[in-house]
């Protein structure tokens, strides 16, 4: 159902005028202090149940969002970590962990909130950011309704759609999405993922002996690579 806000502002206008690119440029134009930083894999950006003071506008790379060690979602290019609430003293809901080295613009959260409060339509930046995040969570909830094989297949399709690289008729998921991470996200054991991957290879959905997860379904098959998944 379309919200009241989206009746006033079309989806296209919201994305063009209040999306990631415009939000970041507005902060820079308003001389909000920031530093551009490169953060390697396995580093923690934010810790759940801890008050955070930083916000990261991700230019490149991938971050996992975890709750009680369960992977809930992922953030990638043109997404924001650390701005899912409007209150300075609000503790983080998730732990944000870098799984593929990121390049990001790092701001103080207080500076961003104060800047937004001073804008006539500043709240729309927060609304759009949170709406996009909620859509991802809804997708995850729907994914969890299936059986193990369907959960794995749909997880791989989702990650391929958001983070994959389509080339030579196939869709290759970044190597940072290991079996362990995929298993956690799909609510499966690593052993189950290994078993189900064999079935998906036999079904022509995955490439065999690939260095990363490679989706073949609807893309056509490729020559197998040397190492196993």
PLM features: what roles do these ranges have?
Residues 1-41, 81, 85-86:
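Cyclic nucleotide-binding regulatory module and flanking cytosolic helices
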Residues 31-32, 50-52:
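Short, small/polar residue-rich loop motifs at catalytic or cofactor-binding pockets
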Residues 39-40, 44-50:
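Short phosphate-coordinating micro-motif centered on Lys-Gly-acidic
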Residues 40, 59-60, 76, 100:
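A cytosolic small-molecule/anion-sensing beta-strand core signal
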Residues 52-68, 77-79:
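Glycine- and acidic-residue-biased ligand/ion/polar-headgroup-sensing regions
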Residues 72-138:
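Cyclic-nucleotide recognition modules
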Residues 124-187:
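Polybasic "coupling" helices that flank or enter modular domains
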Residues 161-229:
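Phosphate-/nucleic-acid-contacting segments
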């Amino acid at each position: 159902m379309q919200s009241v806000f989206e009746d006033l502002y079309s989806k296209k206008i919201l994305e063009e005028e209040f999306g990631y690119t415009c939000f970041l440029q507005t902060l820079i134009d308003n001389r909000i202090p920031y530093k551009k930083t490169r953060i390697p894999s396995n580093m923690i950006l934010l810790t759940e149940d801890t008050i955070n003071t930083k916000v990261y506008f991700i230019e490149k790379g991938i971050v996992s969002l975890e709750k009680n060690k369960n992977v809930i979602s992922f953030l990638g290019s043109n997404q924001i970590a650390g701005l899912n609430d409007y209150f300075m003293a609000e503790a983080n809901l998730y732990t944000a962990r870098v799984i593929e080295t990121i390049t990001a613009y790092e701001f103080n959260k207080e500076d961003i909130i104060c800047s937004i409060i001073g804008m006539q339509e500043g709240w729309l930046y927060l609304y759009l950011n949170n709406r996009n995040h909620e859509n991802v969570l809804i997708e995850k909830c729907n994914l969890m309704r299936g059986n193990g094989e369907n959960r794995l297949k749909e997880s791989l399709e989702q990650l391929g759609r958001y983070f994959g690289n389509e080339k030579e008729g196939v869709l290759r998921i970044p190597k940072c999405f290991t079996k362990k991470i995929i298993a956690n996200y799909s609510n499966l054991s690593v052993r189950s993922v290994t078993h189900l991957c064999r079935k998906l290879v036999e079904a022509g959905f995955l490439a065999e002996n690939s260095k990363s997860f490679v989706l073949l379904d609807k893309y056509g098959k490729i020559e197998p690579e040397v190492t196993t998944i």
